[in-house]
Swiss-Prot record:
GO (cellular component) term, any one: plasma membrane
Stated family: Belongs to the MzrA family.
Gene Ontology MF, one: protein kinase binding
Keyword Cell inner membrane attached: yes
Membrane topology: Single-pass membrane protein
Protein name according to UniProt: Modulator protein MzrA
Periplasmic side stretches: 30-123
Taxon lineage: Bacteria, Pseudomonadati, Pseudomonadota, Gammaproteobacteria, Enterobacterales
Biological role: Modulates the activity of the EnvZ/OmpR two-component regulatory system, probably by directly modulating EnvZ enzymatic activity and increasing stability of phosphorylated OmpR.
Length: 123
C-alpha cells in the first residue's frame, strides 16, 4: 500500500468541503421576489389588495400573497420575471402618485422555520 503525505489528505478533505459548501449555500440563501406599493402623495389611500390581486390575475401574473405592511402593500410573486410584469401592469392600473418598488426578501429554509418555531425547553 502506498503511503501518502498528510497534506494530500488535508487538501482532499478541504476540496470536498468546498464543493459541498458551493452546492449548499444557494439552497440556504434563497430570496423571494416582492413588490412594495405605497402612496407617494398625501391624501392617497392604499389600493385594495383584492382589487390588485384580481387585476394581476387577469393578466396571468401568479401571486403568492398580498399583505399590508407598515404604510404599504407587499406583493410576493413566484419569480423575478413575474415581478417585472407585475410592476409594469401596476404602473398602468394604479393612478399616478403610487410608488412601486422592487425588492427581494430572504426566504428562511424549512429547518430554520422549524428551529424558530420549536419551544425552548429548559430544565
Amino acid at each position: 500500500m502506498i503511503k501518502r503525505p498528510r497534506w494530500q489528505y488535508v487538501l482532499l478533505i478541504a476540496l470536498a468541503l468546498l464543493a459541498l459548501a458551493t452546492l449548499l449555500v444557494p439552497c440556504m440563501v434563497r430570496t423571494e421576489s416582492e413588490l412594495r406599493i405605497r402612496a407617494g402623495q398625501q391624501g392617497l389611500s392604499l389600493p385594495d389588495g383584492f382589487y390588485v390581486y384580481q387585476r394581476l390575475d387577469q393578466r396571468g401574473i401568479r401571486i403568492k400573497s398580498i399583505t399590508p405592511e407598515g404604510d404599504g402593500l407587499v406583493i410576493r410573486l413566484d419569480s423575478p420575471e413575474q415581478q417585472l410584469l407585475a410592476r409594469e401592469a401596476l404602473q398602468n392600473i394604479l393612478p399616478p402618485g403610487y410608488i412601486i418598488a422592487l425588492s427581494e426578501s430572504p426566504v428562511p429554509t424549512h429547518w430554520v422555520r422549524e428551529f424558530a418555531r420549536a419551544p425552548l425547553n429548559l430544565g
